[in-house]
Amino acid sequence: HFVATSPKGHTLKVRAERQLMMDAKNLMQLVYEVQSVNYTGPITILSLLRGGEDADQWYSLMNHVGDDLCWRWMQLQPMNIQLCCAMSCQLKKNDKLVVQRPIKIEKQDVIGYSIAQRIKPGDKLTLCKKVAVVDSNDYAKDHLIDHAIRCLTNL
């Protein structure tokens, strides 16, 4: 938890929380909250999956960014392990679900969504991001995508 103040004096309260799912070892949930103290205007929240810091250690086999979820299937070098990361997210404004198509992001090292909302003092945006990670140590390589998506959708 922290408070951020811009050079113009606009203040936001920010909170981030990671929740591990004990009954689903491949799944975690990240919750981000941004609350306006004295700011009126647009807020953009990015929900992203990155490939990794060391681009020569991995390469993307296939990416997909859909309306409800995105996934990245990767090969890790030199270990010859494949993994699939899948992500879904929901945005709430003042505890009410925002029904809005996010802007899709698909680049070489990052995929995901950008979601913007206007806020005023007292408004709270909450982004709930679910991430599933499965690898070829536990699943057949040709079923990684299906298993990652199933982790997200069978909650």
Language model feature labels by segment:
Residues H1-L155:
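Acidic/polar, glycine-enriched structural segments that form the non-catalytic walls/loops
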